[in-house]
C-alpha cells in the first residue's frame, strides 16, 4: 500500500498498540483509545476503517487524525498526506459503493431510450378512464 494505512496512523498516536494480522475483513484487536483487556475493537485493512464497540471510536484515517489532533478536515488531510510514503502521495480514499437501489425515474436497462412506460400498461384500462 502506498498511502497511509489505518494501522500506521493509530500507531503514530499509540506506539505500544499491536495491530492485528490481516486475516479477515474486520480483524479483532485491543482498543488503543481506552485500553482494554479483551478485544473490543476491529480494524479493516481493506476498508481502511477502525471500530470499537466499547468506547465508540470509529472511522477512517482522516477521522482518527481529527479525533486525536482536534483539527479540521482539511488540516487532517494535510497531516495524513505528510505521513504517507513519500510525503506527497494523496491519502487513499474509501472505495466508492454502488447504489443498492434504483433512482426514481431510471429505467432498468440504462441503455434503452424512448418511453419509460412498459408496453403492457398502455393497453390496459384504468379505473379513472
UniProtKB/Swiss-Prot annotation:
GO MF entries: DNA binding; DNA-directed RNA polymerase activity; zinc ion binding
A biological-process GO annotation: DNA replication, synthesis of primer
Biased composition, class Low complexity, residue ranges: 106-115
Signal peptide: none
Tree of life domain: Viruses
Pfam families recorded: Zn_ribbon_DnaG (PF01807)
Keyword Protease attributed: no
SUPFAM superfamilies in UniProt: Zinc beta-ribbon (SSF57783)
Disordered: annotated span: 87-129
InterPro entries with a match to the protein in the record: DNA_primase_Znf_CHC2, DnaG_primase, Znf_CHC2
PANTHER family: DNA PRIMASE (PTHR30313:SF2)
Protein name: Gene 58 protein
The organism of origin for this protein: Mycobacterium phage D29 (Mycobacteriophage D29)
Amino acid at each position: 500500500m502506498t498511502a497511509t494505512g489505518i494501522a500506521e496512523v493509530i500507531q503514530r498516536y499509540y506506539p505500544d498498540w499491536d495491530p492485528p494480522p490481516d486475516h479477515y475483513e474486520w480483524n479483532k484487536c485491543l482498543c488503543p483509545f481506552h485500553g482494554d483487556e479483551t478485544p473490543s475493537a476491529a480494524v479493516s485493512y481493506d476498508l481502511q476503517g477502525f471500530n470499537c464497540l466499547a468506547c465508540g471510536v470509529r472511522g477512517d484515517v482522516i477521522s482518527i487524525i481529527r479525533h486525536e489532533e482536534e483539527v479540521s478536515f482539511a488540516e487532517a488531510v494535510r497531516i495524513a498526506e505528510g505521513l504517507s510514503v513519500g510525503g506527497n502521495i494523496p491519502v487513499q480514499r474509501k472505495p466508492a459503493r454502488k447504489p443498492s437501489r434504483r433512482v426514481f425515474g431510471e429505467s432498468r436497462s440504462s441503455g434503452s431510450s424512448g418511453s419509460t412506460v412498459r408496453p403492457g400498461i398502455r393497453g390496459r384500462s384504468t379505473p379513472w378512464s
